[in-house]
């Protein structure tokens, strides 16, 4: 049995299908959020990953925006700031596909499903390393939940080896070429990007526009790369 992490497929159902075909039946994938928006099959991918027993679906900032837009529509009967935020981030079609679900009770079921997604998860791997999984990553010692979904300011933070030597943080959220970190030149090389003395790793390959996705083995830290055909 292998345990993997993947993130930020953003509507790329084709890449999900490749990953699914690669997996053995007993494998598990922690999906670190942002299944929808921007890509061609966003709502379908959200439903598919949520319903897939091999995938542990964590919340991303796009799921959070979608839930807030759903709430505005169902409870206040209007498309407000939350909806506009979602649309500005590529979520117009995702929202419309959800809104076209027959019956308000079914719409509410999906709102509750996504609202209840976990924001952080810990996996202790075979080498007894604590692998902390969240959408955006963070620095140990920060406890604000918003960091787990939205943080983009932790890339050059110092790492306290004395207290956190046995921790690895796996995240997505910011496509690797867009990370504000020394040594990056804005070009994408498929795979995982390790930094912070190899205690943090970003696996967001910008799937929507690069056509790449990374599956990271959480025990061996081997990388498996998938690309559009």
Residue ranges of model-derived segments:
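Active-site neighborhood of phospho(di)ester-bond hydrolases with catalytic His/Asp-centered motifs
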Residues: 6-7, 29-33, 57-61, 134, ...
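Active-site environment of divalent metal-dependent phosphoester hydrolases
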Residues: 10-14, 37-40, 64-67, 140-141, ...
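Active-site neighborhood of divalent metal-dependent phosphoester bond hydrolases
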Residues: 42-121, 128-129, 157-158
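A conserved acidic, glycine/proline-rich C-terminal tail/linker
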Residues: 176-206
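His/acidic metal-ligating clusters that form di-metal
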Residues: 103-181
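Binuclear metal-dependent phosphoesterase catalytic core
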Residues: 196-229
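Conserved hydrophobic/aromatic beta-strand scaffold that supports enzyme active sites
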Residues: 26, 117-120, 133, 171, ...
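N-terminal active-site segment of His-dependent metallophosphoesterases
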Residues: 1-48
């Amino acid at each position: 049995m292998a345990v993997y992490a993947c993130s930020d497929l953003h509507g790329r159902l084709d890449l999900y299908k490749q990953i699914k075909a690669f997996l053995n039946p007993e494998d598990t994938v922690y999906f670190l959020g942002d299944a929808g928006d921007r890509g061609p099959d966003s709502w379908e991918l959200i439903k598919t990953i949520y319903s897939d027993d091999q995938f542990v679906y964590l919340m991303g900032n796009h799921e959070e925006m979608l839930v807030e837009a759903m709430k505005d529509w169902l409870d206040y009967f209007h498309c407000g700031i939350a909806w506009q935020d979602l649309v500005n981030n590529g979520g117009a079609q995702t929202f419309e596909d959800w809104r076209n679900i027959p019956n308000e009770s079914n719409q509410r079921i999906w709102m509750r499903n996504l609202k209840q997604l976990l924001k952080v998860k810990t996996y202790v791997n075979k080498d007894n390393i604590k692998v902390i999984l969240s959408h955006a990553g963070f620095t140990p010692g920060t406890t604000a939940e918003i960091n787990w979904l939205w943080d983009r300011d932790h890339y050059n933070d110092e790492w306290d080896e004395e207290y956190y030597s046995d921790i690895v943080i796996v995240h997505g959220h910011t496509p690797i070429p867009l990370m504000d970190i020394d040594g990056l030149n804005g070009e994408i090389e498929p795979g995982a990007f390790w930094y912070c003395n190899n205690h943090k790793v970003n696996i967001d390959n910008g799937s929507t526009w690069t056509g790449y996705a990374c599956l990271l083995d959480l025990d061996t830290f081997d990388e498996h790369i998938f690309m559009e055909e």
